Amino acid sequence: MDVEDLERLAISAYMVGREEACEEAWIAAHQVWLCRGEPERAARCAFWLALGLFFRGDLAPAKGWVARGGRLLEEGRADCVEQAWLKMFVGLPRLFQGNADVYPTFVEAGNVAERFADADASMFARLCRGYALILQGRRVEGMGLIDEVMVSVTADEVSPMLAGIAYCQVITLCQAVFDLRRAREWTEALVRWCDSQPGLVPFRGNCLVHRCEILQLQGTWTEALDLARKACETLAGPPAWDTLGSAYYQLGEIQRLRGELAEAEQSYRQASVAGRDPEPGMSLLRLAQGRLDLALPAIQRALDETQDRLMRCRLLPAAVQILLEGKDVAAARTAADELAGIAAEFDSMYLDALTAYSSGAVLLAEGDAKAALPLLRAAQRSWRDLKAPHQEARARLLIGIACQALGDGASARLEFDASQGALEELGAVPDLVRLAQLTGSSRHGGPLSRRESEVLLLVAAGKTNRVIAAELFISEKTVARHLNNIFTKLQISSRAEATAYAFRHGLVR
């Protein structure tokens, strides 16, 4: 096989997830170039192999191949575009550890790449420069470079392997800085790119994770659940990808929000095994399980270990919620104030909404409903603008509590009804339970939705799932799902207990 064909084979194998074949092809091409006395081309093969290993999380072999490529360039002393890749590999590990001081390294690499008119190296240097600028706090400049990177990617100016890497890194970066608009736009672009190449494995798995995160926020939880499961299957390999932990974490998040608590715990545990810290999801799960004694130390441990300010923003809202549940209002105030301080440094509607909600919740706990109300309304408007129905419903619940505290029972009822309607549509079982606990009532049967109340009545009448499905014109699978929700909401485990609940609460006469 010709050496150029070996290089094409290596890239194709990488794109379809055949890592062993990819490595073998790069190594073979590397050896051919060495035998031909072309160390620069041999070094390039070493760098491409290292790039795939680096983004799969195999850092030790990646460093080994970079060292070999660097030695070849040093021996040849050639002025070539491969020198740009060597410079970037020197800075890459430090950049991904959060060190912004490597920015000049990527400027130098970009200059070399531009001089040789190498589109791949130029794009990658620009991506790393944008990342470094954002780490320096120069977010506007950094995101400008990121947009430029994505223009070259969507215009098909770079190789497929680097295009996929750029998509995933840019979306991850947008999510890290809470730039939801860009994250949504580039996720949709990644979906289209993956759909046009159905054989992709690494990028399709990452694409599913990113898409799942967007769908979760938008409230499309059933589709998000399916995508999360597919992402776990795709990324599990062999070989397993380093983003497998994120896929399991995302699966756990959706299961937790739907009240599938046992399944969520298993998913969080699998995320941990795959290398992803399951916080704050695990702490919020413990809270939903009524295990405040486990939730408090877990979220505190996560905060103690996390120094990065943006990463702390992912933990602080959960900390506020858990601390308020534990009646530690002073500590919740400290966490909310820290969140507000960080959010003030970033132009992010998402962060502003998190801050307004958390601060409003603390003010409510402090007994200042009048001050809490405008913050909670601001949060609710932001969540609506962001098309985040679950977050909006949670804000409306607190708005209702604030209105009630101010003596406006009619407005409180409107907010409670709006919140419950949205939560029922989402299937947010734990939040429906919380709503019933906080308000002392609901529209149908305690925390149950109208359809769940209908199913409960038929269960109390002694009817089987098949008969219930026929009477309500729904599938037996849907009946089973409603029963699972009923058991979770009412904290029961059998049809007999469900029947007893129906009689005890006057639903059956």
Regions found by a protein language model. Give the residues of each.
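Helix-turn-helix DNA-binding segment
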Residues: 365, 374, 437-493, 497-509
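Extended alpha-helical scaffolding segments used for macromolecular assembly and cargo binding
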Residues: 1-28, 32-36, 41-45, 105, ...
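Inter-repeat boundary and helix-capping residues of tandem alpha-helical solenoids
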Residues: 1-2, 6, 19, 36-39, ...
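Hydrophobic packing within well-folded, soluble alpha/beta domains
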Residues: 22, 45, 125, 130, ...
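Amphipathic alpha-helical segments of tetratricopeptide repeats
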Residues: 27-38, 51, 67-75, 107-118, ...
